[in-house]
Each structure stands twice: as structure tokens, then as C-alpha cells.
């Protein structure tokens, strides 16, 4: 049972109480102080000090100072008045226990409020930090977008300058051709004048030298007329024999029928043009060419302007939807923009158009399988992705990059991927 301490001293003013409590040689580390507005307890085993205060105090602003084996309390009163005693008198044990329990509940509620306030402050700090990070990321994203836009504008200007240069060069060549044609026409006129002058000179000379030789004069004049008027061109026909296409394939592995079918499909794809598009009337002549649009999309892809590249491929596909490379290149753009389902659709369409499988389209089919497999893996459909990678390896078994990626996918599926 602890020993009650009674040899304390206290003083007061209208606003504060100063309490001095001796520690009796007990180490400061073993001292526990508990204070509320109506209750003060100091536990330093084997001693105990307990005071049921005469009036409420401001326990948040009150202070305790330890020094010289003594604790000095400065207790600020809530109401400015002089106390008759430090602790209330005539209090029974039940009242004391009730005051203790009430003080403990108040302390617990304050601790809970302080914890909630601290958590709220922490959430506010995290929210503020998140908003700052989002703002920084937004600025970085805007900076990157501005850089991309500047690069796109630069590429567009360069393309327009190149087209203007080509137009001027074509005009210059046209002017040169017209000038050469005019010069040739002038030369022909001069030659005709010279021939006419020579014929007149010969006629006059023949009259003067041989006035009686009518027959000889007629012979020379007829010969001169024949020389001055060119004979009409003879009609002829030219027969052209094309060299047959020979594929470098062994006879036992020959795919002549498939290769001929593939060449036939390519020829049909080049002829398949859809000109019934309303926007075509606003386009230049070269912009109506799917090959030119494909090259333009490739240049935009190289400058990381993927949306503009997709627009170029879209128009090219509207003009000619039989070219597999348009779908294959658009799938690469969708992969960069994380449009994974569209990348899968375009890769599948490219594989449909790359039939029958021959050596000439092997590289394109391998790329289509890899891009579709990559999209499947990013959608966490690893089994489907591995199937595409294995199909790509069947086409090109010596591709080391595809081999490494396929092995990684197998490890993910088996749940044994090595930690890097």
C-alpha cells in the first residue's frame, strides 16, 4: 500500500496555485504525474500524492518543473478567486472514486480527441502533399505535351516545306520542258525555212542552166519535194513478254500456289481504292495516296506523335482497307497509347490480311503476333500472350529478344519469375 505524502507546501494568487512536493529521494524516472481540471495525482513508489482540487484549473496550460529533488507545480485557475484550501474537505470515498473515474474518462476522451486531431492533421498534410505532387505531375505532363506539340508543329512545317519544295521543283521542270519544246519548234521552223529556200534556189538555177531540159527539171523538183516532205510513219506492234516471278524455295518445300495467291492478293490490295469519301475533295493529290499516308504516319510515329499517326493510318485504311501494314503500324501506335483492345483488333486484322503464310510476309506476321501478345500480357492475359509469342518464335526461331520475353511470360504463368 503506498504511503500518502502530506509534507507539501502551496501558495496562491487569484490566478494561480504554486505547489511544491518533495520526491523523498525517489528517481525522477519512476515518477508518474496525472492531472485533470479537478484532480492531481503524483505516483512515485512507494509514495503517493493525491489532491481533489478546490476549484477547476486549466490543466492544458498548467506546468510542472522538477529540480532539487522537488516537483514544483504551477496550476492556473479557470476563475480568478482565492481558494480556502488546496483540496476539498469532507469528501467520502465514493465521491473520491467518482472524481477519479471521471478524471480518467476525461483524460481518455482528450487523448482520443488529440489522436483524432493528429490523424486529421496528418490526412490534411497528406492531402496537401498529394495535391502538390499532382500539380507537379500536371506541370510535367503539360511540359511534355508542349514539347510533343512543338515537335509535331516542327514536323508539320518541315513536311509542308518539303511539299512546297517538291511543287516548285515540279513547276521548274515543267517550265524547262516547255522552253525545250519551244526551242525544238523554232528549230523545226528554221529547218523548214532553209529547206524551202534551198528548193527555190535549185529551181531557179535549173531554169537558168537548162531551159530546154524540161524532163530533167521535173525529175529534180519531184525529188526535192519528196525530200522536203517526210513520209508517214509505218504502223507496227510491239510484243512484251514478262519475266516470270521465281521464288527461292526448294521444290520439296515449295509453296508456289500460296506464293502466287499472296502476290495476287497484293495486286488486288493495290487496286482496291475507295474514292467515295466526302473528305477527299478537300485533300491534295498526294494525300489521296494510301502509300503516302502510310509514310507520313511512320514519320509521325518516329516523332512520338502517336495520335496524328493514327489519324494518317485511319484515312489510309478508309481509302484502302486491304493493306495489312496499315493495321500493323496502327497497332503499334495503340500499344504506345495503352489502347490495348484496339491494338489486339488491329493485330488480328493484320494477321487475317497476311494470309496465306509465305516467306515474303513472314516478318510482318511475326511482328503482328508479338504486338498482339504484348497487348494480352499488359491486360494480364498471360496465357494468350504466350501463345502469340510462341507463334512468333515458330516464324523466327532465332530471335533472341522474343525468346527472352517468352521465357519471362512462362515464369509469370508458373509463378516462379526470378527477382531482379
Swiss-Prot record:
GO terms for biological process: cilium movement; determination of left/right symmetry; epithelial cilium movement involved in extracellular fluid movement; heart development; inner dynein arm assembly; neuron migration; outer dynein arm assembly; regulation of intracellular estrogen receptor signaling pathway. It is found in: Nucleus; Cytoplasm; Cell projection, Neuron projection; Dynein axonemal particle. Residues 7-103 are annotated as: Mediates interaction with ESR1 and STUB1. TPR repeats lie at residues 290-323, 324-357, 366-399. GO terms for cellular component: cytoplasm; dynein axonemal particle; extracellular region; neuron projection; nucleus. Involved in neuronal migration during development of the cerebral neocortex. May regulate the stability and proteasomal degradation of the estrogen receptors that play an important role in neuronal differentiation, survival and plasticity. Axonemal dynein assembly factor required for ciliary motility. This is Dynein axonemal assembly factor 4. It comes from Pongo pygmaeus.
Amino acid at each position: 500500500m503506498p504511503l500518502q505524502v502530506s509534507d507539501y507546501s502551496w501558495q496562491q494568487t487569484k490566478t494561480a496555485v504554486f505547489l511544491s512536493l518533495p520526491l523523498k529521494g525517489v528517481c525522477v524516472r519512476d515518477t508518474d504525474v496525472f492531472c485533470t481540471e479537478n484532480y492531481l495525482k503524483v505516483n512515485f513508489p512507494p509514495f503517493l500524492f493525491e489532491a481533489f482540487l478546490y476549484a477547476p484549473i486549466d490543466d492544458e496550460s498548467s506546468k510542472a518543473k522538477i529540480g532539487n529533488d522537488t516537483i514544483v507545480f504551477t496550476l492556473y485557475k479557470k476563475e480568478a478567486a482565492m481558494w480556502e484550501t488546496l483540496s476539498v474537505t469532507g469528501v467520502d470515498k465514493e465521491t473520491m472514486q467518482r472524481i477519479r473515474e471521471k478524471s480518467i474518462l476525461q483524460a481518455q476522451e482528450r487523448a482520443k480527441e488529440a489522436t483524432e486531431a493528429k490523424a486529421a492533421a496528418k490526412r490534411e498534410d497528406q492531402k496537401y502533399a498529394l495535391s502538390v505532387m499532382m500539380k507537379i505531375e500536371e506541370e510535367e505532363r503539360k511540359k511534355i505535351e508542349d514539347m510533343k506539340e512543338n515537335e509535331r508543329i516542327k514536323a508539320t512545317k518541315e513536311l509542308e516545306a518539303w511539299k512546297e519544295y517538291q511543287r516548285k521543283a515540279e513547276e521548274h521542270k515543267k517550265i524547262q520542258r516547255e522552253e525545250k519544246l519551244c526551242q525544238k519548234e523554232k528549230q523545226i521552223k528554221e529547218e523548214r525555212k532553209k529547206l524551202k529556200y534551198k528548193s527555190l534556189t535549185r529551181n531557179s538555177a535549173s531554169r537558168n542552166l537548162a531551159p530546154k531540159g524540161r524532163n530533167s527539171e521535173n525529175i529534180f523538183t519531184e525529188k526535192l519535194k519528196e525530200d522536203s516532205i517526210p513520209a508517214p510513219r509505218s504502223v507496227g506492234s510491239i510484243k512484251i513478254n514478262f519475266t516470270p516471278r521465281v521464288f527461292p524455295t526448294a521444290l520439296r518445300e515449295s509453296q508456289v500456289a500460296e506464293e502466287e495467291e499472296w502476290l495476287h492478293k497484293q495486286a488486288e490490295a493495290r487496286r482496291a481504292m475507295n474514292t467515295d469519301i466526302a473528305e477527299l475533295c478537300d485533300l491534295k493529290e498526294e494525300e489521296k495516296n494510301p502509300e503516302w499516308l502510310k509514310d507520313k504516319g511512320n514519320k509521325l510515329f518516329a516523332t512520338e506523335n502517336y495520335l496524328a499517326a493514327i489519324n494518317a493510318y485511319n484515312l489510309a485504311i478508309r481509302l484502302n482497307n486491304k493493306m495489312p501494314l496499315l493495321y500493323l503500324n496502327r497497332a503499334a501506335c495503340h500499344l504506345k497509347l495503352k489502347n490495348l483492345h484496339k491494338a489486339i483488333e488491329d493485330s488480328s486484322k493484320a494477321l487475317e490480311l497476311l494470309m496465306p503464310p509465305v516467306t515474303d510476309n513472314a516478318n510482318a506476321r511475326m511482328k503482328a503476333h508479338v504486338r498482339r501478345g504484348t497487348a494480352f500480357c499488359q491486360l494480364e492475359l498471360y496465357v494468350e500472350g504466350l501463345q502469340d509469342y510462341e507463334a512468333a518464335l515458330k516464324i523466327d526461331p532465332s530471335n533472341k529478344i522474343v525468346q527472352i520475353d517468352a521465357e519471362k511470360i512462362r515464369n509469370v504463368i508458373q509463378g516462379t519469375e526470378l527477382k531482379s
